[in-house]
Amino acid sequence: MPRVKRGVQARARHKKILKQAKGYYGARSRVYRVAFQAVTKAGQYAYRDRRTKKRQFRQLWIARINAASRQNGLSYSRFINGLKKASIEIDRKILADIAVFDKAAFSVLVEKAKAAL
């Protein structure tokens, strides 16, 4: 069998990893072995945090809605329950946005939720 030389593939693979590691500090951006570990770990963090981001934003929206609804004399859980009973279907992202930027409209929603309870 003829000898197989893999220099071209190895160079391409190394270049790909070093390109991904561009901007990293020190050896992480220059040495293939270290860069490979750094890129792999960065990928793991990115995968994990794409899922964590969804949870964190939901927590943030709930905290904002809770604060705004308590200013109007209703706890978060009772407010959400009232909205469901009043058959008002607005998701938490939009509710949080209304709570921050349009306090008058949020007060109207709280009153409707109170009436439905």
Curated annotation (Swiss-Prot):
BP term (GO), one: ribosomal large subunit assembly
Origin superkingdom: Bacteria
UniProt cross-references to Gene3D superfamilies, sorted A to Z: 6.10.160.10, Ribosomal protein L20
Gene label: rplT
Protein name (Swiss-Prot/TrEMBL): Large ribosomal subunit protein bL20
Entry keywords, A to Z: Ribonucleoprotein, Ribosomal protein, RNA-binding, rRNA-binding
Organismal lineage: Bacteria, Pseudomonadati, Pseudomonadota, Gammaproteobacteria, Vibrionales
One of the record's GO cellular component terms: ribosome
Record's function text: Binds directly to 23S ribosomal RNA and is necessary for the in vitro assembly process of the 50S ribosomal subunit. It is not involved in the protein synthesizing functions of that subunit.
Family: Belongs to the bacterial ribosomal protein bL20 family.
MF term (GO), any: structural constituent of ribosome
Organism: Vibrio metschnikovii
Annotated Pfam families: Ribosomal_L20 (PF00453)
